[in-house]
């Protein structure tokens, strides 16, 4: 079972992503920045694999991978026009938006693993081997837990450096819940 990803976690990931990777289309940066500036939109954003199966999905790629630069899917229509997708996002703020990011080492990135959600729209028969799927989910859960623990440890160290007892206590409680 997957816990929901918070708006702040999604924003933090997008900031990290934009600082570490260059998207093939500049409009993609505009879209991600627009989404980050609206919490109500970020609540509807889901980072997934295979966004082409979603009712409303976007695929964005960085320069370091050999994938399509940009695609927007809505129902059974696909476009490479980023401006049309931007207008759709603006006009349909209440609809879920599924984003697939193609970048080098995506599956080894704990930052990405922390926000990656299961795509509920992938056809069931797409997975031929349930054992592989279960194993992948376990690896992903372990990776997320490790990332969260490391992040909390870093924040605890920073709180100690600042002599911030209140933040330290709060973070220590969070860490004990993860352990």
From Swiss-Prot:
InterPro entries: IDEAL_dom, UPF0302, UPF0302_N, UPF0302_N_sf, Virus_scaffolding_prot_C. Signal peptide: none annotated. Pfam families: IDEAL (PF08858), UPF0302 (PF08864). Belongs to the UPF0302 family. NCBIfam families: PRK03636.1 (NF002965). This is UPF0302 protein BPUM_1989.
């Amino acid at each position: 079972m997957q816990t929901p990803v918070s708006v702040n976690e999604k924003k933090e990931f997008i900031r990290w992503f934009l600082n570490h990777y260059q998207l093939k289309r500049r409009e993609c940066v505009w879209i991600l920045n627009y989404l980050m500036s609206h919490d109500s939109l970020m609540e509807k954003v889901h980072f997934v694999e295979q966004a082409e199966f979603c009712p409303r999905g976007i695929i964005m790629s960085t320069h370091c991978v050999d994938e399509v630069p940009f695609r927007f899917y809505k129902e059974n229509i696909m476009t490479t026009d980023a401006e049309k997708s931007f207008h759709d996002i603006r006009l349909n703020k209440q609809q879920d938006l599924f984003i697939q990011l193609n970048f080098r080492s995506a599956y080894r990135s704990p930052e990405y693993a922390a926000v990656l959600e299961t795509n509920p729209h992938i056809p069931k028969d797409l997975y031929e081997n349930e054992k592989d799927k279960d194993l992948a989910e376990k690896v992903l859960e372990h990776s997320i837990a490790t990332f969260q623990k490391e992040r909390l440890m870093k924040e605890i160290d920073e709180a100690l450096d600042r002599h911030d007892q209140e933040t330290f206590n709060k973070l220590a409680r969070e860490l004990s819940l993860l352990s």
